[in-house]
Design a protein with these regions (language model features):
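Extended, acidic/polar low-complexity N-terminal regions with helical/coil propensity
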Residues: 1-358
Length: 358
């Protein structure tokens, strides 16, 4: 009699579990996460409500954990690490963000279903499953996704070929060699991650924390090296054109917040050079004497020079962006150009009148 009861229980459990198993094998994760997760959770509630033997708290907890594991496995299949850590980190970031979103949707649907549906199934029973246990692996997996996104962003900044050769001057070759060294060190760091690729999304392996900690430490060292490079480059910048060319060559470093702030400061440095040029030209124009026969030509040359400098900085605004200091410099530029132009016209009139009386 005892054996018959056990057989009946086993048969019943297998019937219900087979329904869930067949469905979970065909989950459309992450593409159709909302419908897939909703149906899977409703099947679990169906087992909870209808199964005479399997509907215990512990068994329901195991089923929910199994669903979490299945979602993670399908997300892992969706993520192409070769792509993310290879030649297309941007696509890798998109895949990882989609999986993070998928996990968030799963959590949201779980909360909604378990709060709004269970109360209508059986008023005498309460769904008291430990939610922390259900989502513990999901939380770890999401953090691993964020970790890999961090690595992808570092690859965008420090990897690939750099356009450092656009920087002119006698030290251009030296700067390029230094950047190649940074790039080489980055790939050494990245290879440590690629070698450990099997543990990246293995939520049971805590050794990943050591790997990502080591990566972040080296990543910070590389960032400091780039800071030193940028500062060294701009120590030797003497004119607007060199400054704009340098910022253009270093554009990819704007993807990193600290480096973006540093490049913004260097952009202000370029504006300060322009401001100094404006003041120098203004003083030069004011000091032009009527006794000089070529004063009109001199003032015209000053105007053309300033307008050329203006053209260089304003053309760069589209891809560098403006700044408050730059706006002030532009106001000063407009004033100085107007003053010099009026002075040029005045001297032209004076020169014409003086010639008539000769």
């Amino acid at each position: 009699m005892h054996i018959d009861a056990r057989l009946e229980e086993a048969s019943s459990n297998l019937t219900y579990l087979d329904i869930l198993l067949r469905f979970c094998k065909n989950l459309k994760i992450p593409d159709d996460v909302e419908n897939s997760v909703t149906e899977a959770l409703l099947l679990i509630l169906f087992i909870w409500a209808e199964s005479p033997f399997y509907s215990t708290k512990r068994n329901m907890e195991i089923l929910c954990q199994a669903l979490s594991s299945q979602i993670i496995e399908q997300c892992k299949e969706y993520i192409k690490l070769d792509v993310a850590l290879g030649n297309n980190p941007e696509m890798g970031i998109q895949m990882l963000e989609k999986c993070i979103f998928c996990c968030n949707v799963y959590r949201s649907i779980y909360d909604n279903v378990m709060v709004n549906v269970t109360c209508y199934i059986n008023l005498n029973r309460q769904w008291d499953i430990n939610q922390q246990e259900v989502f513990s692996k999901i939380n770890i997996f999401q953090q691993r996704c964020y970790d890999v996104i961090e690595i992808c962003k570092a690859l965008i900044v420090f990897g690939r070929d750099a356009k450092i050769g656009l920087i002119g001057g006698p030290n251009g070759t030296e700067y390029e060699a230094y950047l190649r060294e940074i790039q080489s060190l980055f790939y050494e760091n990245l290879n440590e991650i690629i070698t450990a690729r099997d543990i990246v999304f293995d939520v049971t392996r805590s050794i990943w924390f050591i790997k990502i900690k080591q990566f972040r430490y080296m990543d910070l060292q590389l960032e400091n090296m780039v800071v030193n490079l940028i500062n060294d480059i701009f120590k030797n910048i003497k004119n607007i054109e060199e400054g704009v060319e340098a910022i253009y060559a270093l554009q990819k470093f704007k993807e990193r917040e600290n480096l973006r702030e540093l490049l913004q400061k260097k952009w202000i440095q370029v504006w300060k050079i322009f401001s100094s040029e404006i003041e120098y030209c203004y003083i030069n124009a004011i000091n032009q004497s009527r006794k000089e026969t070529d004063i009109g030509v001199n003032l015209l040359c000053i105007l053309r020079y300033l307008r050329n400098q203006y053209s260089i900085v304003t053309n760069a605004l589209d891809w560098i962006g403006d700044c408050d200091f730059g706006n002030c410099v532009l106001q000063r530029y407009e004033h100085v150009v107007d003053v010099i132009d009026e002075r040029r016209k005045m001297f032209n009139i004076y020169s014409t009148n003086a010639t008539q009386y000769l």
